């Protein structure tokens, strides 16, 4: 994801397994899976539009965890209160540091987002069973806004007045970082001249 005014990029589709795994458990239809996937993308993209996680020393898998939680909650049919608690549980327990993607990269780089998905589904399951989370996790004096991002509003979500962010999806031509796409195209063109 690289929205037109995004402060962070990343892969919102990393959150799709939350809808798939919960759908199997809950025995829901493909419609619910698609809805959960769109919700995951929308939440991730809205966070990426507002929070430059990398600049603050954190990893984008925080957004994957929160997006996965929202997706799982929707597919599981959780109430608004249960969903709020699930999001609080995930956010309180899944603050991933940015070092997982920089320097000498370990195997954990490939697991950070998957761990966020797992934690999102687990938090939704806990909330469904009545577990509560710190509901002031975003705006409390020691919360997300204070410690990570500064205050922000997510803005209007996709629907009647605003297009869904998933409609801005793009595909990479090559399995390399987005900033290397044009360089690789040039290399392939030059290769035939050598």
Segment roles from a protein language model:
Residues 1-7, 51-52, 168-169:
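Active-site flanking loop/helix segments enriched in acidic
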Residues 1-46:
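Hydrophobic alpha-helical hairpins/lids featuring a short glycine-rich hinge
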Residues 2, 46-56, 96-104:
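Glycine- and aromatic-rich loop/turn segments at beta-sheet edges
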Residues 6-13, 33-37, 53-65, 109-115, ...:
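Active-site nucleophile and cofactor-binding loops and adjacent substrate-binding regions
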Residues 62-65, 70-194:
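Functionally critical mobile loop/hinge segments
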């Amino acid at each position: 994801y690289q929205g037109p005014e995004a402060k962070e990029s990343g892969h919102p589709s990393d959150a799709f397994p939350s809808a798939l795994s919960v759908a199997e458990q809950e025995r829901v239809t493909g419609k619910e899976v698609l809805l959960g996937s769109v919700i995951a993308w929308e939440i991730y993209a809205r966070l990426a539009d507002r929070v430059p996680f990398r600049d603050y020393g954190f990893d984008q898998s925080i957004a994957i965890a929160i997006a996965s939680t929202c997706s799982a909650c929707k597919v599981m049919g959780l109430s608004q209160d249960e969903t709020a608690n699930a999001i609080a549980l995930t956010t309180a327990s899944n603050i991933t540091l940015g070092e997982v993607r920089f320097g000498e990269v370990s195997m954990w780089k490939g697991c950070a987002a998957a761990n966020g998905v797992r934690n999102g589904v687990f938090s939704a399951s806990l909330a469904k069973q009545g577990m509560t989370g710190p509901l002031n996790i975003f705006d409390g004096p020691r919360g997300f806004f204070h410690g990570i991002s500064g205050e922000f509003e997510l803005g209007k979500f996709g629907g009647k007045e605003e297009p869904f962010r998933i409609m801005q999806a793009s595909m990479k031509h090559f399995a390399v970082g987005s900033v290397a796409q044009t360089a690789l195209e040039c290399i392939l063109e030059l290769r035939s001249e050598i």
